[in-house]
Amino acid sequence: MVVYADLLQKMLTKNRAYEINKGKTKELFDYWMEKCKKLVNKSSIKEFKQSIFDIVSDFEKIEIDTSVIKPKVGIVGEVLIKYHPFGNNFVADKLEQEGAEVILPDFMGFIKFIATHKITFNKLIKTDAIKAKLFKTAIKLIDLLEKPVISCLLYTSDAAD
């Protein structure tokens, strides 16, 4: 679900900043959030990859106006501050109202950071080698899950970002 959430968040913030018909991006985001909740429980790898393609394709259909490039503003800090509107006092909404394109880091990146930290910690103080191998396996699995997302995003209209 985290891979879906990261992709949907990325598509939401990118499109919402430039959408011509206000509200269409959020409407599509909500539709895909509900659909992804169902897909998580019963989809195969093939269906997962197809759904990633479908999400990107649907968001690409939203009319946007990029004639005026907006400043990109990243939200950083503790996890709750970055991702939860109540935790950051709705800063993303305020930034968008001021004409910015909000950039949020992928949550999966945070998970990979934690796993990498555990591996490094193991190397430095020689703790449980089995746990280190589990974290390495987790990173490989994350990379495997993110691969179709990265592939799809390479072919979007904003691939340079």
What are the functions of these language-model segments?
Residues 1-157, 161:
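An N-terminal assembly and electron-transfer interface module characteristic of large anaerobic redox
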